[in-house]
């Protein structure tokens, strides 16, 4: 839908031209009543109740002429209904896919709650806290939304990526690319480059098929000084002296694609150091975006006061511009604390409440692996949504979602709002205008419920169902035309790139600026096998997928397992007991368990993430005693508990673990049993079945070069020792 056609339709519904701009602006209460005693409006009452503490703050919105508020609201509702009718007729909403709810889609918060969850507030309190974030849309209407001094207003330099990405793209180009995505006539042109001897990157940009386009590397000088930062951020973060080099090696890799608004999928090395460094950078980027957005609106407010007939498109349907998704309250605390420290704002409302609910100094047992201690330290509650609003004087935590600039949430917390069982409580309008999305620690989120992440993407950048006081005269056309996904930047940070991570960045992101991701080259000495330290037979068996059908891959794997591996267990020339079968996916686990119950006479037990503590203890004990010959063990249980399974003599990996640390931890079960004299390493075996689709996991276990050979060579069985 073109700019002119939409505006003509909107004007026809209003019944006038240009004058509607003045009428659609927010209404501001007069500072004093006339002596005649004018009646108090509903807005006055709401402000008196909710904002007695904010009387000293001045609204940033322009004051309109005095007129009846109820009539004005009625006009605005009619305009909005008319606009929705137009939009829905031109952009019919696709039918939602029905999701099958089975055990595999349950939230994993229930796993290991007794060991790791440290929650001072019950689930009911947490749910009420989240629901309160949707109430009281007018709670902060009197706040001054200015983020700093007037001197720090943007210069609107066309070289600023904020300007070129959001404000300078021709409407015809956006329409053409949007239609190309709808008709699947888009291809990605890519360039590759080296970051170091052991790391490379690939940058790909969407191009309409049949058109020529030059795709260049995003790298400039790998310097923060190449970008237009707000002055208050430079002062707060010591970035005034260009002679200094404040960026780390990791930040130099990310600064160019990040500040150019490219989508990012970044695989990092160190839990502690790397996470702190990339959060430093994206916190700065997020703040810069928020400040520029709010200052642009303030600047245009002043322009409209001087000349009401001018047109300034600078807003979305709702205020929230940044969504940050993290796995636990501990990570949320670290992210929010980082944003506060870099903001240059001293006053933080409800900071004490936030620290009480999110901060926790408790640590997991020191006997657990270091990665476990990092992931499960502090407050591991995974049910929360918090809004952050930036005003001239303060950062307001726990702000109403529709009045927030940044929303920090867990997948489970926001899922409760988006897919609430009570349809009256479902809302997603506050996600309609998200321009930056960050997914932090995706590798941890994958063990919670990755489907929640895909649900979030389903609800991003949609036309809202309600008005939410939007000023339609200032909404950008690409919002109205449902093209906001072409402008949204998505940044995903993970310890290990997985098929799910690739699916998100490749399948759910349409950023016209393109996508950037790195690739680690893993030498054999740094692989899991190279670091295991055990001289034990490790056999990798490949099964082929006929027709290269990804959808049918689980069926081919199951068929291979039941026709090759199970008979091998029954007729084993090695140990007949102490066999641990490690299964990453819960649906595969259910399938194998049912098969072994119904089709075999093998004496086996199982432990999984939904087992009771009594079942876990009993089956582990029976397996150690040899009374159970085979034990089925799920990866999610291992992630949440990191059990030391005793009595293991041989291991079968139904699929390579996504986390290479898990491979070594499970193999060492055999080593510890051998140390006790209960097994012989010359007889014990480790067997891993894989397909060429397991390449990402495989290269972390055997190394990049070996993984290429294992995946593509004619030989199907490889052995390491």
UniProtKB/Swiss-Prot annotation:
One Pfam family, short name: UTP25_NTPase-like
Biased composition (Basic residues): 15-31
Record's compositionally biased regions (Basic and acidic residues): 1-14, 88-105
GO cellular component assignments: nucleolus; nucleoplasm; nucleus; small-subunit processome
An annotated GO BP: ribosomal small subunit biogenesis
Residues where Phosphoserine is found: 53, 63, 196
Entry-linked InterPro entries: P-loop_NTPase (IPR027417), UTP25 (IPR010678), UTP25_C (IPR053939), UTP25_NTPase-like (IPR053940)
Keywords: Nucleus, Phosphoprotein, Ribonucleoprotein, Ribosome biogenesis, rRNA processing
Residue ranges the record marks as coiled coil: none
Biased composition annotated in UniProt, kind: Acidic residues: 55-72, 140-161
Subcellular location, record wording: Nucleus, Nucleolus
Gene Ontology molecular function, alphabetical: rRNA binding; U3 snoRNA binding
Residue ranges, annotated region (Disordered): 1-168
Subunit architecture: Interacts with snoRNA U3. Interacts with MPP10, NOP19, RRP9, UTP8 and UTP18. Component of the ribosomal small subunit (SSU) processome composed of at least 40 protein subunits and snoRNA U3.
Family of the protein in this entry: Belongs to the UTP25 family.
Additional facts recorded: Present with 172 molecules/cell in log phase SD medium.
Function noted in UniProt: DEAD-box RNA helicase-like protein required for pre-18S rRNA processing, specifically at sites A0, A1, and A2.
Name this polypeptide is given: U3 small nucleolar RNA-associated protein 25
Source organism of the structure: Saccharomyces cerevisiae (strain ATCC 204508 / S288c) (Baker's yeast)
UniProt lineage: Eukaryota, Fungi, Dikarya, Ascomycota, Saccharomycotina
Chain's gene name: UTP25
